[in-house]
Amino acid sequence: MGSDVRDMNLLPPVSSLSGNSSCNMPVSSSAQWAPVLDFPPGAPYSSLTPHSFIKQEPTWNPDPHEDQCLSAFTVHFSGQFTGTAGACRYGPFGAPTPSQATTGQARMFSNAPYLSNCLDNQQGMRNQGYSAVAFDGTPSYGHTPSHHTSQFTNHSFKHEDPLSQQTSLGEQQYSVPPPVYGCHTPTDTCTGSQALLLRTPYNSDNLYPMTSQLDCMTWNQMNLGSSLKSHGTSYENDSHSSPMLYNCGGQYRIHTHGVFRGIQDVRRVPGVTPAIVRSTEANEKRPFMCAYPGCNKRYFKLSHLQMHSRKHTGEKPYQCDFKDCERRFSRSDQLKRHQRRHTGIKPFQCKTCQRKFSRSDHLKTHTRTHTGKTSEKPFSCRWPSCQKKFARSDELVRHHNMHQRNMTKLQLAL
């Protein structure tokens, strides 16, 4: 399985912000560990451990954008946050009290539209080292996103290269999708036994996130889906809340290991294979589903899905080593069957007529001609008043052609 490894070092915070002076964000010189997200009220979370995990999986809800491709990968990050005070909070939880502004914990992801009373514009904020990267998206808690509409679609965010943070060469501008909606509360955070879930659909035209969501969930490898759903139920009936991500005066590091979906995606990034999507509990018998657009095939094993994904990517790693034969195959068993053409080996023999075959499915089809059982002739003629059955599909095709020729002759005679 291929991987996409990104190493993002955000710009260090500065001691002052442009804009409204009411935004008070003192920054300490010593690095401190702080929670990454805000979470819903009443969540029994303590502090987030320095080393935490974000497991990215596709949303369980129907994707309204059919042209987007799902991705599934794990993000491991460790963060050092230097901001000692909470940022200006606006939205469903209201503005912070003076005590919260001085004793609150550092927050993650500043964004000018969310903090319009604190910052004059997003560009000024970006130049000062804030909002170096932001993942934005629409809510997905089992309800339609009609309550949360996109308000800022023309902004952009950047990825700062640690080697050239002070130059324009380290800056890549990407289009920012609608605002992020996550779980937040001014005081509660996640514990080390829990995890943060990041769900991001990817568009096949580019490899950068179009929408994403950060959620808190109990870390349970056996049942991740139900934990997430139970966590988001408190928001299903809240039609007026519009939770926002908050400002963080900090520096952190993200390491991602993942896979992407889509033909265009895979061809643009060498060594990257399509995404692997775990299904919900309703499909536990075939838990591995292909996430390629328009393909919903499911498999018992992960290896089977990986082999299937090569049909979409066009990857053929197995090559015939016989002289003057350069044919390539996506699966090892296909190569093995092909090589029997060169060697002449036919390991499968009919016990009735002793005829040999190079493939087991060919032998199975052949044995139906001996038994004559209706149950072993699955191909039925659908021509009116014809009830013949055949053991092989090619026999049925020839039979249909016979009907067609007879009909043509009859029409010409009339």
From Swiss-Prot:
UniProt name for this protein: Wilms tumor protein homolog A
Predominant localisation class: nucleus
Similarity field: Belongs to the EGR C2H2-type zinc-finger protein family.
UniProt entry tagged with the keyword Ubl conjugation: yes
Gene, per the UniProt record: wt1-a
Domain notes: Binds to DNA motifs with the sequence 5'-GCG(T/G)GGGCG-3' via its C2H2-type zinc fingers. Starting from the N-terminus, the second zinc finger binds to the 3'-GCG motif, the middle zinc finger interacts with the central TGG motif, and the C-terminal zinc finger binds to the 5'-GCG motif. Binds double-stranded target DNA, irrespective of the cytosine methylation status. Has reduced affinity for target DNA where the cytosines have been oxidized to 5-hydroxymethylcytosine, 5-formylcytosine or 5-carboxylcytosine. The 9aaTAD motif is a transactivation domain present in a large number of yeast and animal transcription factors.
Short sequence motif named 9aaTAD, residue ranges: 217-225
Taxonomic lineage from the root: Eukaryota, Metazoa, Chordata, Craniata, Vertebrata
Organ and tissue specificity: Expressed around the pronephric anlage and in the pronephros; expression is restricted to the splanchnic mesoderm (the site where the glomus forms) from tailbud stages, and the glomus of early tadpoles. Not expressed in the pronephric tubules or pronephric duct. In tadpoles (stage 38-39), additional expression begins in the heart. Also expressed in the adult kidney (mesonephros).
